[in-house]
């Protein structure tokens, strides 16, 4: 992609989940993966979601996401390198990663690129829900945490083996001083470290360990966060800085699915919006119900709210709903839940008022479970 913030094009990778073309009524959360120039890190995210994550046992939370990889280049011809992307300008002098001739100072521009150019591009070219997760490793994990503090860039954050001590523990200090309780909506924050903090061949030094200890101690203290924020802090002793990425990412993504199932399914905003929902199929007969995550949808009672049969092929309903609205269709019991052909498994979700008119289609071979 061309960018007004850089003198070079930004390489971006985009993965869409299986069924994306078929499931035209599903709008997907987006995961932004940094350091995607290491292709294995980008590929691990969608592979682990499909192969190593336990699905929500209640069937409400899908493991399908759009994955966007942001590559950080090494461009010798213009003297631009990975560390430029992930480090700000120093506040405490030119030492450590900020020595004269080192590479730093463009992290504010990378944030602007993501917020002002990449996210709008993804939104206009793909069916997105509006919810986002940022994933980083090592210095890109530091960038992800810094973006949480300075720009509130994503909704959720996974930081694996972050450098928390650069620029005289700047990131650790910023996290300790940030007012996390100001955010009331659900949020997931995961941070981990491998053998970098343990005595042995993988030890990365006392400063690295001290920075991590400050950040991990803060994140573990629930009193710093609102009740809708879930933090998970883990360590993986015996793994090195690089081979610890996979076990940590596996744990993080599984925690994230659990967070979604427990915290996102029940959450709704304060405002209500007009919504029109149709269910289409052949030879429809009464009764057909819609049920979901709020009073106007019957609060997940199997006989939630009866839909109007406008013909033998269309049932519809008009409601004012809090968003995100999550719902399913039944014939009056959970044993007779609708089988939908044009939406992903899990709850059907209306995330925002831009996509408040929905048309769902029953599977032609079998409309309902148990029939």
Predicted features and spans:
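A short, amphipathic beta-strand motif
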Residues: 273-281
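Aromatic-rich carbohydrate-binding modules that target alpha-glucans
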Residues: 281-324, 332-353
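Compositionally biased low-complexity segments at domain edges in trafficked proteins
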Residues: 355-371
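Low-complexity, intrinsically disordered short peptide segments enriched in small/polar/basic residues
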Residues: 119, 346-347, 356-359
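Compositionally biased regions
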Residues: 224, 342, 357-358
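Non-catalytic cap/lid and distal C-terminal segments of serine-dependent acyl enzymes
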Residues: 1-270, 291, 295, 310-315, ...
């Amino acid at each position: 992609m061309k960018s007004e913030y850089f003198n070079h094009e930004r390489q971006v990778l985009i993965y869409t989940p299986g069924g994306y073309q078929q499931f035209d009524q599903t709008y997907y959360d987006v995961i932004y993966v940094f350091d995607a120039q290491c292709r294995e890190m980008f590929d691990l995210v969608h592979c682990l979601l499909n192969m190593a994550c336990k699905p929500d046992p209640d069937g409400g939370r899908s493991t399908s996401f759009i994955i966007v990889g942001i590559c950080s280049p090494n461009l010798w011809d213009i003297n631009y390198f990975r560390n430029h992307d992930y480090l700000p300008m120093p506040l405490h002098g030119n030492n450590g990663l900020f020595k004269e001739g080192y590479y730093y100072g463009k992290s504010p521009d990378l944030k602007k690129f993501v917020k002002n150019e990449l996210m709008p591009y993804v939104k206009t070219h793909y069916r997105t829900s509006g919810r986002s997760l940022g994933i980083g490793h090592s210095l890109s994990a530091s960038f992800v945490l810094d973006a949480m503090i300075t720009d509130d860039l994503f909704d959720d954050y996974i930081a694996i083996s972050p450098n928390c001590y650069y620029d005289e523990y700047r990131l650790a200090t910023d996290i300790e001083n940030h007012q996390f309780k100001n955010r009331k909506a659900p949020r997931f924050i995961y941070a981990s470290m491998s053998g970098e903090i343990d005595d042995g061949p993988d030890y990365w030094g006392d400063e690295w360990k001290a920075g991590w200890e400050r950040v991990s101690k803060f994140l573990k203290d629930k009193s710093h966060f609102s009740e809708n924020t879930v933090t998970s802090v883990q360590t993986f002793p015996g793994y090195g800085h690089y081979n610890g990425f996979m076990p940590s990412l596996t744990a993080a993504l599984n925690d994230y699915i659990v967070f979604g199932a427990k915290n996102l399914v029940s959450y709704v905003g304060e405002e209500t919006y007009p919504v029109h929902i149709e269910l289409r199929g052949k030879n429809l007969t009464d009764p057909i119900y819609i049920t979901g995550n709020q009073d106007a949808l019957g609060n997940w009672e199997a006989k939630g709210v009866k839909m109007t049969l406008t013909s033998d092929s269309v049932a519809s309903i008009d409601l004012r709903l809090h968003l995100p609205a999550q719902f399913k269709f039944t014939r009056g019991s959970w044993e007779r839940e609708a089988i939908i052909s044009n939406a992903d498994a899990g709850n059907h979700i209306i995330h925002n008022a831009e996509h408040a008119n929905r048309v769902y289609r029953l599977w032609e071979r079998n409309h309902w479970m148990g029939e």
